[in-house]
C-alpha cells in the first residue's frame, strides 16, 4: 500500500466530512480536533456554518434509500451587517414499491412512531451558525417541528421528517449569520449513498 495515497484518502475523507473520529484519550482527541476530524460544530461567528443533521428514527437500514437535496440562495444584506440566506431541504425516499414489497422490518424498521411501512423516519436537527439564527418559513405535512433547543450556545431547530415513497419531506428556512461573519455560510450535511446506489 502506498502511504501517500492512504494519507491523501484520509485527508479527502476528513475534508468532505465523510471521515470523523473520536478518542477517549484527551491528547489523542486534541490531535483529532486539530485535524478537523472530530465532527464538532463550528463556534466561530467569523466562519459561519449551518449544520443539517439527520438521525435514523426508523430503527432500520432504510437510509440506504435516502436522497438529500439541499439548496441555498443568494444572501441578502441586513441593516445590522448580518446576512440572511434562504435555504431549502428536501428528503426523498428512493425505494420503489417493488423493493418495499420484497423488504422486511430489518430494512424498513419497527419504530411505532412511523406513519406507514414505507416511512423513513428521520430525526431532523438544524444547527444555526455561531452568532446567527434560523427561521423556518415553510414546511410540508411530512415535517413535524418541536421546540427549538440550544447546543453550546447555538440555536437548534428540532423535528421529525416522515419520508415516504412518493411523499418527500420539505422544509424551507432562512439562516442569518452574525455581523462578525467574514466568510460565506458553509453547510455541513451528512453523506449518503445517493450518488453510489
Model-based region annotation:
Residues 1-197:
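Lumenal/extracellular ectodomains and adaptor appendage modules
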Amino acid at each position: 500500500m502506498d502511504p501517500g495515497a492512504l494519507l491523501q484518502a484520509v485527508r479527502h475523507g476528513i475534508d468532505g466530512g465523510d471521515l470523523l473520529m473520536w478518542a477517549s484519550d484527551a491528547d489523542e482527541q486534541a490531535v483529532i480536533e486539530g485535524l478537523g476530524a472530530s465532527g464538532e460544530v463550528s463556534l466561530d461567528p467569523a466562519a459561519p456554518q449551518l449544520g443539517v443533521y439527520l438521525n435514523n428514527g426508523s430503527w432500520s437500514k432504510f437510509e440506504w434509500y435516502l436522497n438529500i437535496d439541499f439548496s441555498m440562495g443568494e444572501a441578502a444584506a441586513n441593516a445590522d451587517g448580518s446576512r440572511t440566506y434562504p435555504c431549502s431541504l428536501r428528503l426523498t425516499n428512493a425505494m420503489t414499491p417493488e423493493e418495499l414489497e420484497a423488504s422486511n422490518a430489518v430494512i424498513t424498521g419497527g419504530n411505532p412512531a412511523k406513519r406507514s411501512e414505507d416511512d423513513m423516519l428521520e430525526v431532523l436537527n438544524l444547527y444555526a451558525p455561531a452568532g446567527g439564527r434560523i427561521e423556518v418559513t415553510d414546511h410540508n405535512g411530512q415535517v413535524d417541528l418541536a421546540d427549538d433547543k440550544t447546543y453550546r450556545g447555538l440555536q437548534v431547530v428540532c423535528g421529525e421528517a416522515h419520508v415516504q415513497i412518493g411523499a418527500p419531506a420539505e422544509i424551507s428556512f432562512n439562516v442569518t449569520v452574525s455581523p462578525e461573519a467574514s466568510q460565506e455560510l458553509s453547510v455541513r450535511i451528512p453523506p449518503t449513498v445517493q450518488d453510489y446506489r
